[in-house]
Design a protein with these regions (language model features):
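ABC family nucleotide-binding domain
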Residues: 1-178
Length: 179
């Protein structure tokens, strides 16, 4: 493709960039010379919503959201569950908190993935083609959640083929072609 997903993976340090730098929180980080400490600090302020949800199949929606808070952020379980329930409510999935991924539609699974991202209180959320794995009739529910986040001022870096959506909710649109 044109390098959209690779670009997202590079700004989240999931892949090594050949050159350039990232400006985050007013500070410039050269890709070729960034410390593990700086990467960890940036990741604490970001969240990633993957194309194929990346939910744990053996965990409920609630536990998919709490897992990273408890294990990764060392948050007490009761606090993690409070944050997870609030995030699930925000994306319209609180009533499905005890459902497993196989019991949810693709759109519902992606909304759980968005709740997982929101629960970390990120400054920016990276979205990698969040609707590409969805049936067309389910795309609207995910875009609706993202539209609401944009209205609330959430900073998002979105890789998408939904050009109308991108134009309507974005401050800036970058069209990538040929890497």
């Amino acid at each position: 493709g044109s390098g959209k997903t690779t670009m997202l993976r590079c700004v989240n340090f999931l892949e090594h960039a050949d050159g350039g730098s990232l400006i985050f929180d007013g500070k410039e980080y050269p890709f070729h010379n960034i410390s593990k400490k700086d990467i960890a600090a940036i990741r604490q302020k970001t969240a990633f919503v993957f194309q194929n949800y990346n939910l744990f199949l053996n965990k409920t929606a609630l536990h998919n959201v709490t897992e990273g808070l408890i294990i990764g952020r060392k948050m007490p379980k009761t606090r993690a569950e409070e944050k997870a329930r609030a995030a699930l409510e925000k994306v319209g999935m609180l009533d499905r908190a005890d459902y497993y991924p196989h019991q949810l539609s693709g759109g519902q699974q992606q909304r759980v993935a968005i709740a997982r991202a929101l629960a970390t209180d990120p400054e920016i959320i990276y979205f990698d083609e969040p609707t590409s794995a969805l049936d067309p009739e389910l795309t609207g529910e995910v875009l609706g959640v993202m539209r609401q986040l944009a209205k609330e001022g959430m900073t998002m870096l979105v890789v998408t083929h939904e050009m109308g959506f991108a134009r309507n909710v974005s401050n800036k649109v970058v069209f990538m072609e040929n890497g």
